[in-house]
Regions:
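Short, well-formed alpha-helical segments that are part of the catalytic scaffolds
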Residues: 13-29
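Acidic donor-binding segment of Leloir-type glycosyltransferases
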Residues: 24-64, 82
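Glycine-rich, basic loop-to-helix element that forms the pyrophosphate-binding segment
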Residues: 65-82
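Short beta-strand-to-loop acidic/aromatic patch adjacent to the donor-nucleotide binding site
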Residues: 87-98
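Conserved donor NDP-sugar-binding/catalytic core segment of glycosyltransferases
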Residues: 98-135
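A recurrent flexible, glycine/aromatic-enriched loop bordering the glycosyltransferase active site
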Residues: 158-159, 168-189, 241
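A short, conserved alpha-helix in the catalytic core of glycosyltransferases
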Residues: 180-231
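Active-site-adjacent helix/loop segment of glycosyltransferases
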Residues: 211-264
Length: 264
């Protein structure tokens, strides 16, 4: 039986959290013969509300952080208290996603491979009707990253770029296989990742978490693999969709600057 931990991060999104936990209940029940699920909630809400959810098919622990630590900051906060290395898989997730009935069943079927560091599932957007994964199939070149950093320093130019790209964007579909990075809303990390990389330590409040994980996998010769037979639904925008544009650019600038400084 495979042990799976879910580290989910909540910030004043209790309705979405309940829906997320309900979906875990359904998926856990379907896979109760093959997986054991433990859910750990990092609650960044200030003030936090009582989370009174009773499950018959997984264990649940709540960790109020007492302040908003951001996405990976909150995940690290809980991981420092409950080691992800004790599990076969550790999932880091937003609460604005929903598991499908067979999410854990399909994950349990994946053969053990010590070279896997990160598994990216199909993350289907109910808003845009496409799969967010893979987020990137190849590593970004330094020139592209520097251009992106420049744009985040100049929000008006960034907005113009977004308008142009939105007009001409198209969405490709991809077969399963090795990729550079998956999407950050639902991240499946393996025991091998934590054995080689340790618990996550990304000292940026928000954004570019995916590149941090991708670079850690590259550094430690671990694969990032896209496996679309594992299905997750993206509801989208519960917390990050509320961030003002100037703050959005500030966080992105800090994130991309960290990636360039530490990995390029």
């Amino acid at each position: 039986m495979k042990k799976i931990a879910i580290y989910c991060i909540n910030y004043h999104s209790y309705d979405s959290l309940k829906d997320f936990l309900d979906s875990i209940e359904v998926a856990s029940k379907k896979a109760e013969q093959v997986v054991k699920i433990s859910v750990f909630i990092a609650d960044n809400s200030i003030p936090s509300e009582e989370i009174d959810f009773k499950s018959q098919h997984y264990s649940l622990e709540v960790y109020p952080t007492g302040r908003n630590l951001g996405y990976f900051g909150a995940a690290e906060y809980v991981m420092s208290r409950v080691s992800p290395a004790d599990f076969d898989y550790a999932i880091i997730s937003n609460v604005d996603v929903l598991l499908t009935e067979n999410t854990f069943v399909e994950l349990s079927k994946i053969p053990h491979d010590s070279t896997y560091g990160w598994i990216a599932p199909s993350l289907y957007s109910q808003t845009y009707h496409f799969d967010w994964n893979p987020q990137a199939t190849k590593r970004y070149c330094i020139i592209k990253l520097r251009i992106m950093r420049f744009l985040f320093k100049h929000p008006l130019l960034l907005r113009l770029k977004q308008i142009v790209l939105h007009k001409y964007r198209h969405f490709d579909t991809y077969p399963s296989g090795n990729i550079y990075a998956g999407h950050g809303s639902f991240i499946i990390l393996t025991k091998a990742f934590f054995n080689k990389c340790g618990i996550i330590h990304y000292p940026v409040f928000l954004y570019f978490e995916e590149m941090y994980l991708a670079e850690e996998c590259l550094k430690h010769q671990l694969k990032v693999v896209y496996l679309p037979q594992i299905h997750v639904l993206d509801i989208g925008g519960t917390s990050t969709g509320k961030i003002p544009s100037k703050i959005y650019c500030k966080y992105n600038y800090e994130g991309i600057n960290y990636i360039i400084s530490n990995y390029y």
